[in-house]
Amino acid sequence: WLAHFAADVAAAAREVGFDGFHLDQYGYPKAAVRPDGEIVDVAASFDTLIRGVREAVPDATLVFNNVNDFPTWSSPSAPQDAVYIEPWEPVTTYEALARVATRARLVGGGKPVVLAAYQSIYDKAARDVGDASTRLTMATLFSHGATQLLAGEDGHLLVDPYYVRNMPAEDETLDMLASWYDFLVANDEILVDPGIVD
């Protein structure tokens, strides 16, 4: 299966021109048993997957989605370009986001840490409330050495894990995001330097 999948990924890179890949997973089950009763180490199987794809596309950008922080304790050592985490319950507070970001930096081997902390608040509340929540989320992540996957194409925001379900941002929100991203770039030596730890 892995050889077939890796060959398909390499073909996509070669024939379609993709220069990067996001390897996804469901997050569950975290344990598996084969029909013959053999227990499968799911975390180790993801490591094998990442390594197999990296061999097939050595020059592509490659990230693996650690859904709900699984298996962040092992996957960052695999040959990928960032530690990417999609947090779900019980990661529902800024404190919990900070813990996830800090832990990812500790095991990340100097790789950038990116969290897909979707701002679904924009679906439920006025823009100013969504912007306030986004500022708090970005402050939490930036101050713990991580960034947030939020800004999409054509001024849209990712508000849901199903990326095609995104939301156009108002001009005020885009201006706010630009100022925060400018701040991150201007201060990256102290915010996301992998050598700085809590």
Model-based region annotation:
Residues 1-112:
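Active-site neighborhood of glycoside hydrolase catalytic domains
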